[in-house]
Every structure is written in structure tokens, then in C-alpha cells.
């Protein structure tokens, strides 16, 4: 199933039995659709997950019990955002580690178990990544996967494929505290910022604000250590990236 989390901390559980038609046309999903139009986060929940970690632009986060989120009344205020807003969230388990990434190219790795599981409904944001640079803010939160290559995309179209942390000489070490500033993940120039990061199995498609798109096979991108600048992937202002599946034409083999 999936969870939709609005920028102001309201949540909706989308069970497997809800069809696309039900969601698009159902009056009961009107507020949820409006929240998605305003930048809500769509989170996939694996069966092994027991927690939902909600992350705000200012780097603060909170860990909530997933079973309570799933059974909550649709649109319930599960977290109080105060003067910030939710930018990302992920479903995870007690044994997982999380990777926080900021727009200035900083990254922080932390164990989920270091965060207290908050059972009080509508609680505020607490621990997280310490945002120290002016104009910086958190942009992504992922379940850390050291055996996979992380692809990082910048607003000005730079594409960076990192060595897996099993291979890299500059590893993303786990933090000992619950609020630190992070390490350098991607080297940026001028006003460029990170807009997305993902673990892609086969390919990545970069999307710009004027409707252009360009795809890359992950295996065709040279993998490097963190704190590198990456290659030019596409011209224009990138707004996000999505994972792509590559199919091979049997007649061309």
C-alpha cells in the first residue's frame, strides 16, 4: 500500500483495493488530491516496514508507528509542522538506516533506531539534519542501500552516479548523534542545487520545467566517489527525476 503525506502534515492511506478511478473521481479523496497538487509526498510502504519517518525542509524529522498511520482517519494531522513544511518521508524498519540529502549537496546517514518512535498524535518535528548554510534545505530522505549506486541530479542538469558504499573510498559514515550537518555528497557550482536522488536499477529520466526529458542507462554513467561534480545530463531547469526500466528490442540483439 501507499501513504500520501501533505506538506502540512496530514496523511491518507491508499490501500491496494483502491483503484485509480476511485481515487480520481471519489469525493472522499478530494482533499487528498488537492494536497498532491500542492506538493504532497507519495510513499510506498514495503511489508517489512514498521515506521514512517517524516522529514521537513528545515532538516527536522519525526518517526511514527506505521500501523497507527495506516489506520488513522483519512486526512488526520499526524505531525505538526509549525513554520516549516514536509518535504519527504519514507517507510522503514527498526533495522534500517536513512540517508538525508540537502539542496546544497550535503548528506547524512543515520540509524532509524536512534530516533524515538513517537506515539503521540500530531507531535512536532524533533531530531534530524542540521541545516547550517543560508538558503539550504532538505530535499530527499531515502532508506540507505550501501550495495546500490545512488544517482544524484541537480537543478542545472548535472547527473552524478556514485560508487556503492561497498566500493567507495569516500564512504558516507553513519552519524553517532541524531542532529549533524552531514558530509559533502555532490559538488555544485554557482547557484546550482540538488533536486533529486534515487537508487535506480536500470535507468534514470531527468524532467525539466519546460516539459523536456532525457533518459540515461545507469550502467552507461561512470560511477565516482562522493563530492564530485557529475556530468551534464540535460539543458534546462530540472525539477525531478524518475526511475526508468530499459527494454531491449529482440530484433536488435
For each feature predicted by the language model, list its residue ranges.
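Short, structured "edge-of-domain" segments at secondary-structure transitions
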Residues: 1-253
Amino acid at each position: 500500500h501507499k501513504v500520501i503525506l501533505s506538506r502540512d502534515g496530514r496523511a491518507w492511506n491508499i490501500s491496494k483495493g483502491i483503484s485509480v478511478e476511485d481515487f480520481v473521481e471519489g469525493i472522499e479523496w478530494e482533499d487528498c488530491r488537492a494536497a498532491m497538487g500542492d506538493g504532497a509526498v507519495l510513499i510506498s510502504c514495503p511489508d517489512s516496514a514498521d515506521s514512517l519517518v517524516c522529514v521537513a525542509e528545515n532538516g527536522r524529522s519525526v518517526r511514527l508507528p506505521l500501523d497507527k498511520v495506516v489506520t488513522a482517519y483519512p486526512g488526520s494531522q499526524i505531525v505538526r509542522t509549525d513554520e516549516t513544511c514536509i518535504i519527504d518521508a519514507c517507510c522503514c524498519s527498526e533495522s534500517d538506516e536513512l540517508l538525508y540529502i540537502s539542496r546544497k549537496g550535503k548528506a547524512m546517514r543515520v540509524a532509524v533506531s536512534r530516533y524515538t518512535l513517537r506515539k503521540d498524535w500530531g507531535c512536532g518535528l524533533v531530531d534530524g539534519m542540521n541545516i547550517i548554510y543560508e538558503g539550504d534545505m532538505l530535499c530527499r530522505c531515502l532508506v540507505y542501500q550501501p550495495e546500490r549506486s545512488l544517482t544524484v541530479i541537480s537543478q542545472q542538469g548535472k547527473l552524478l552516479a556514485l560508487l556503492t558504499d561497498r566500493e567507495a573510498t569516500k564512504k558516507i559514515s553513519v552519524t553517532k548523534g541524531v542532529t549533524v550537518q552531514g558530509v559533502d555528497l555532490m559538488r555544485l557550482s554557482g547557484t546550482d542545487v540538488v533536486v533529486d536522488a534515487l537508487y535506480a536499477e536500470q535507468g534514470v529520466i531527468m524532467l525539466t520545467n519546460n516539459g523536456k526529458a532525457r533518459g540515461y542507462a545507469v550502467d552507461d554513467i561512470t560511477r565516482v566517489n562522493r563530492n564530485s561534480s557529475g556530468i551534464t545530463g540535460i539543458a534546462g531547469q530540472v525539477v525531478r527525476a524518475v526511475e526508468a526500466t530499459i527494454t531491449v528490442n529482440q530484433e536488435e540483439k
